[in-house]
């Protein structure tokens, strides 16, 4: 069973429908206690970083997610969910993150590319990856974001993507923590394969 954390931040129902389409049981809940017994947890999200981390704190997910990872469970962040895993964010001020991956969330700066990035873009794989097993390098995925993750440890970066004059980190994979900046549930067959790979790893 895949547990999808409901903390009031967007795209969780579309993520659940994608798992349903794949025939993978998935449940949505705002109660961290119901994570017990679920080895796979998904942290989706669309919205503002500060409001999201406050909601995670209020609902008790902040400690529960850390405990889940510490016990060997797998955690998968999508879009804002990926950003929340880092140490801090500069989105509309300065905010503490979950601190599961050392690094910061930064705003794109560009005179040439329109921000936010909205649409399809390709990934460049940086390591042998569980998430991207069976997916060709340079495959395209669907992005919607104005901020990007800047991890301190290069070893945690699973893929990068070129936008706004930089190769930013578009996927993370390390010690049972997985995350993607794009929306796999909106990324056709390649995106569905990412979800399948997470559920089956």
Swiss-Prot record:
GO terms classed as biological process: L-histidine biosynthetic process
E.C. number: 4.3.2.10, 3.5.1.2
Gene3D superfamilies: 3.40.50.880
Subcellular location: Cytoplasm
Catalytic residues (UniProt): 79 (nucleophile), 183, 185
Main location: cytoplasm
Pfam family, one: GATase
Domain (Glutamine amidotransferase type-1) ranges: 1-201
CC annotations in GO: cytoplasm
Disulfide bridge positions per record: none
Reactions mediated catalytically: 5-[(5-phospho-1-deoxy-D-ribulos-1-ylimino)methylamino]-1-(5-phospho-beta-D-ribosyl)imidazole-4-carboxamide + L-glutamine = D-erythro-1-(imidazol-4-yl)glycerol 3-phosphate + 5-amino-1-(5-phospho-beta-D-ribosyl)imidazole-4-carboxamide + L-glutamate + H(+); L-glutamine + H2O = L-glutamate + NH4(+)
Pathway where this protein functions: Amino-acid biosynthesis; L-histidine biosynthesis; L-histidine from 5-phospho-alpha-D-ribose 1-diphosphate: step 5/9
GO MF terms held by the record: glutaminase activity; imidazoleglycerol-phosphate synthase activity; lyase activity
Keywords assigned: Amino-acid biosynthesis, Cytoplasm, Glutamine amidotransferase, Histidine biosynthesis, Hydrolase, Lyase
Subunit structure: Heterodimer of HisH and HisF.
Function: IGPS catalyzes the conversion of PRFAR and glutamine to IGP, AICAR and glutamate. The HisH subunit catalyzes the hydrolysis of glutamine to glutamate and ammonia as part of the synthesis of IGP and AICAR. The resulting ammonia molecule is channeled to the active site of HisF.
Descriptive protein name: Imidazole glycerol phosphate synthase subunit HisH
